Each structure stands twice: as structure tokens, then as C-alpha cells.
């Protein structure tokens, strides 16, 4: 599996803010949009070449008409089809889930200097308390907090975390409120030697591996955890660790060494009866930050049964640049590809609720504390893109291999001649 990738600059992402033009991404995904851009430009370029070299005027009338019609069809047909799908799309009637997106607005550059973790916990819980004030029903509610909100989670021993204990005690006051939040978590391993290339030594016989995780907690001891698997190269993970970790050690360990899951897993928003027994599970896919840029990755959540998607992120590192706005808009494409509603929590913004058409139903402002309340629809249907995967990408990869083989065979043939 490729460990270095950067899908941020896919041409198909260019339509993230004009979702009415790309509703057919539910079939072909974002790479289908890249193919559309490529084909449209190629057809226009071909017409310009025909006109500039005079060959256009040597075509007969039928050839001219066919060439012009083909170019127009490539350019306009997908957009017209998409507009028809956009205005004809109806939100499925059925179950919904109440959600609250929390935006604590904590500057990551001063996160550990200006505020203690306990103070940050108070900020978040005050926001949640405000959102829950006046709550009378006992149906499930999902509260979502941003990526890496805390850094004191030890996998397999959550009781060591003051944050976990504080959240659990708070949630005991609110029946069926589930809190999804991000955490830097750690796995301690006892071993005489390094258990893996990515493990760092704590002391003799003790090693630690780090994760960028999402935790789902309620007022019980039954916590769920998911480790981010699409990690940012260098910042979070060292690619091809058998080779690069040795180089990183020589440089003093400047690269990240987070360990992710090999396969995605779901988290459940749970409804419990008065005795605490689970009576209903709502399976959710939680994309942690950079994961939301990967179409196939998000589709995998839905293949595994996710009825809705959540995105937790901390986009404050970029400052007031186009990055955080682009990151938000890409979530709209994931909604179209999977036809799933999305709730998005971003530390300093922009948090949002996005429907299955890709429209941003509601959102917060940038760099200010906020609480966003709403509902998301739940769905069990799978789109063609989810069911069949990224066929455009696979087809292009196959064609690239065939083209390479053709070039090699052709070159060898010329040498023999």
C-alpha cells in the first residue's frame, strides 16, 4: 500500500463549492471530476488545434458538426445531468440523529502554554452544558468535539486519563448523550527490544507508540476508540519506517511516528434504557482531519455500515489561509459520494452540518467559540461509488500500466529492427 499520497490537489476537488455541478460523483467520485476536467480541456484544445492549422476547414460538414457536438457534449452534459439530480434530490424520510458540534476555539500554538488540560475540559463542557440546557427527551444525542482535544489517553487503561473520567462523570447527568472527541493517545509496550520501527523508548524494557484517535464516550465505562489511519506524512507518520526511521533517528527524531489502524472501524452512538442496557446502535464513520480528503477511505466507512459521517479536525495550524475553507468544502464531496449527512467539528472553525446533497445546512464562523446544533439524517443505502469503489482510478491505473508496457514493447521492437 502506498504510504505517501496527497489527494488534496485532485482536479475534481475544484467543484467542491459548486456541488450542483457534480452530483454524479455518487457514481464516479472525485476522480470522475478530474476526468471531466481533463476531457473538457482536451476537447477544447483539439478544436483549437484544428482551427489553427486549418484542418478544421478541410473537414466535411458532418465531421465539423460531430467534432463540435462532441466537445459541447463533454463540456455540458455532466453539468446538466448534475443540475437535474441536484434539484430532483429528495432527502430520505426516516430516522434522524440530534447532533451538537462543539468549537472550543483553542489556539493550538498556545494550547499547552496558556491553558492546562483541565481548563480546556471546562471550556468544552461549558459549551456542551449550554447546548444540553433544557433537554427533556431521552433520545440519543451526538456531541462532537475536535481532533486532538486532549493528550492524556492511554489505550486499554482509560481510567488513567483525567479527561476521560471528567467527561464520563459529566455525561452521567445526561441520559443517552454520546460525546465524540479527538485525542492524542498512547500504547505502552513492555519489550526487551524495540517492538516496532515506530515505537519510541521510554525506559529500559518499556516502549510507547502514539496514535491520533477518536473516542466515543457516554456516562458508562463502555468507551470506544478509533485510530486515524490516513496520517499526514512527516508531521504524523514516518513513511516506510524500516528505512526512514533509521534516518529520522540520526536527525534526532523530528518526524511523527503515529501508528494508525490497518482497516477502518466504526463507532456507535448508543441509546440505553433506564438500566443502562444498549437498545439501539447508530453506526458512524469518524474521519479524523486529513482522512476526510480521501474519497475511497470515507466510502469504506459506509461499506462497513455507517449511517452517517462525522469529521473531527483542527485546522487552526494553517491560520487564516484558504486551507481551512478548502478542507470544509471537500466534506461536501464526501457527502455526495456516499449520500451521507455529515457533522463536522473543527477546533477554531469552520464547524458545519452538511446534508447528503453536499449543501452546508449550517456552519460556524472562523476563529471564535461556537456551538452548532441540528439534526442529521441516517441512511443505509449505498451509492454506486460506495458499492463499486473508485472505478475511474482503477481504470486509469490499468491504462497507465498498459501504456507503459506498450511503450516498452515498441522500443524493444525498434531496437530489433
Pin down the residues of each PLM region.
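Enzyme catalytic cores with a strong preference for nitrogen-chemistry domains
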Residues: 1-417
Amino acid at each position: 500500500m502506498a504510504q505517501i499520497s496527497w489527494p488534496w490537489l485532485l482536479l475534481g476537488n475544484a467543484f467542491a463549492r459548486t456541488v450542483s455541478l457534480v452530483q454524479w460523483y455518487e457514481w464516479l467520485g472525485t476522480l470522475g471530476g478530474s476526468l471531466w476536467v481533463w476531457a473538457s480541456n482536451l476537447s477544447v484544445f483539439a478544436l483549437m488545434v484544428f482551427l489553427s492549422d486549418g484542418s478544421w476547414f478541410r473537414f466535411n460538414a458532418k465531421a465539423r458538426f460531430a467534432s463540435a457536438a462532441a466537445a459541447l457534449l463533454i463540456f455540458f452534459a455532466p453539468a446538466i445531468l448534475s443540475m437535474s439530480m441536484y434539484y430532483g434530490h429528495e432527502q430520505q424520510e426516516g430516522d434522524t440523529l440530534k447532533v451538537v458540534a462543539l468549537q472550543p476555539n483553542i489556539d493550538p500554538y498556545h494550547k499547552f502554554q496558556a491553558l492546562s488540560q483541565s481548563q480546556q475540559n471546562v471550556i468544552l463542557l461549558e459549551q456542551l452544558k449550554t447546548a444540553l440546557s433544557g433537554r427533556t427527551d431521552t433520545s440519543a444525542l451526538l456531541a462532537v468535539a475536535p481532533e486532538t482535544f486532549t493528550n492524556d489517553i492511554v489505550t486499554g487503561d482509560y481510567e488513567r486519563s483525567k479527561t476521560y473520567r471528567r467527561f464520563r462523570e459529566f455525561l452521567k447527568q445526561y441520559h443517552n448523550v454520546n460525546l465524540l472527541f479527538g485525542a492524542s493517545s498512547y500504547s505502552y509496550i513492555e519489550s526487551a527490544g524495540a517492538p516496532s520501527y515506530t515505537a519510541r523508548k521510554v525506559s529500559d524494557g518499556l516502549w510507547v507508540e502514539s496514535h491520533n484517535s477518536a473516542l466515543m464516550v457516554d456516562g458508562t465505562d463502555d468507551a470506544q476508540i478509533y485510530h486515524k489511519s490516513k496520517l499526514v506524512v512527516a508531521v504524523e507518520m514516518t513513511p516506510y519506517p524500516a528505512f526512514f526511521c533509521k534516518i529520522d533517528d540520526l536527525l534526532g527524531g523530528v518526524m511523527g511516528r503515529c501508528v494508525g489502524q490497518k482497516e477502518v472501524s466504526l463507532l456507535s452512538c448508543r441509546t440505553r434504557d433506564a438500566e443502562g442496557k444498549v437498545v439501539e446502535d447508530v453506526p458512524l464513520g469518524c474521519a479524523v482531519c486529513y482522512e476526510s480528503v480521501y474519497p475511497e477511505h470515507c466510502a469504506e466507512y459506509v461499506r462497513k455500515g455507517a449511517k452517517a459521517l462525522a469529521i473531527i479536525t483542527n485546522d487552526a495550524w494553517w491560520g487564516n489561509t484558504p486551507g481551512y475553507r478548502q478542507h470544509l468544502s471537500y466534506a461536501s464531496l464526501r457527502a455526495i459520494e456516499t449520500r451521507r449527512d455529515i457533522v463536522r467539528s473543527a477546533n477554531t472553525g469552520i464547524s458545519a452540518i452538511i446534508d447528503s446533497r453536499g449543501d452546508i445546512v449550517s456552519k460556524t464562523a472562523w476563529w471564535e467559540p461556537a456551538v452548532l446544533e441540528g439534526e442529521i439524517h441516517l441512511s443505509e443505502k449505498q451509492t454506486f461509488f460506495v458499492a463499486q469503489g473508485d472505478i475511474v482510478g482503477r481504470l486509469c491505473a490499468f491504462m497507465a500500466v498498459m501504456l507503459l508496457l506498450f511503450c516498452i514493447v515498441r522500443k524493444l521492437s525498434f531496437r530489433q529492427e
